[in-house]
Amino acid sequence: MRVQICAVGRLKAAPEKHLLDDYISRLDATGRGIGISALPVCEVEEKRRLQGSELMEREAELLLAAIPKGALIIALDERGRIETSEAFAKRIGTLRDSGAADLAFLIGGANGLAPALRERASHVMAFGAMTWPHMLVRVMLAEQLYRAVTILSGHPYHRA
């Protein structure tokens, strides 16, 4: 199963970018042994000066166009379900075992994800009730994906 993070906005060469790249590399190296690989992080950006719901809808179009066709969508949103790392790993393992080919994690921009995109997702998850900057959410998600594959493979990284 291929896993991709797709987000609105671009990360500059900064500590967050280095952390993201490191966790994606670890995810790919560890996950390959259990049938999970990482696709490059996808970044989309709307150049026109749109506002509010019009901007969110356009960002949703860009996100959907950027992910693999037929990918299962997991949306990150503050209204989503909060899970433990173990439950998240189990979800990833179940999706892999059910034959899912591609899994796309979508992160919205400053206004969040369009409601229609959240409804289209097979799962909506949150990293708590707080709002997080999209730069940090990418790193947090990449780390949790890496943690999930270490849990699934029995690697000692996760100590619960």
Curated annotation (Swiss-Prot):
Q: Which residues bind S-adenosyl-L-methionine?
A: 76, 108, 127-132
Write the Enzyme Commission number(s) for this entry: 2.1.1.177
Record keywords, A-Z: Cytoplasm, Methyltransferase, rRNA processing, S-adenosyl-L-methionine, Transferase
The UniProt GO MF terms for this protein read: rRNA (pseudouridine-N3-)-methyltransferase activity
EC category:
transferase
The GO cellular component terms are: cytoplasm
**Protein's cellular compartments:** Cytoplasm
Pfam families hit by this protein: SPOUT_MTase
Major localisation: cytoplasm
Note the InterPro entries from the entry. Alpha/beta_knot_MTases, RlmH-like, tRNA_m1G_MTases_N
Show the catalytic activity.
pseudouridine(1915) in 23S rRNA + S-adenosyl-L-methionine = N(3)-methylpseudouridine(1915) in 23S rRNA + S-adenosyl-L-homocysteine + H(+)
Its quaternary organisation is: Homodimer.
PANTHER family named among the record's database cross-references: METHYLTRANSFERASE, RIBOSOMAL RNA LARGE SUBUNIT METHYLTRANSFERASE H
Function per UniProt: Specifically methylates the pseudouridine at position 1915 (m3Psi1915) in 23S rRNA.
Q: Which family does it belong to?
A: Belongs to the RNA methyltransferase RlmH family.
Task: Name it.
Answer: Ribosomal RNA large subunit methyltransferase H
Species this protein is from: Parvibaculum lavamentivorans (strain DS-1 / DSM 13023 / NCIMB 13966)
* Taxon lineage: Bacteria, Pseudomonadati, Pseudomonadota, Alphaproteobacteria, Hyphomicrobiales
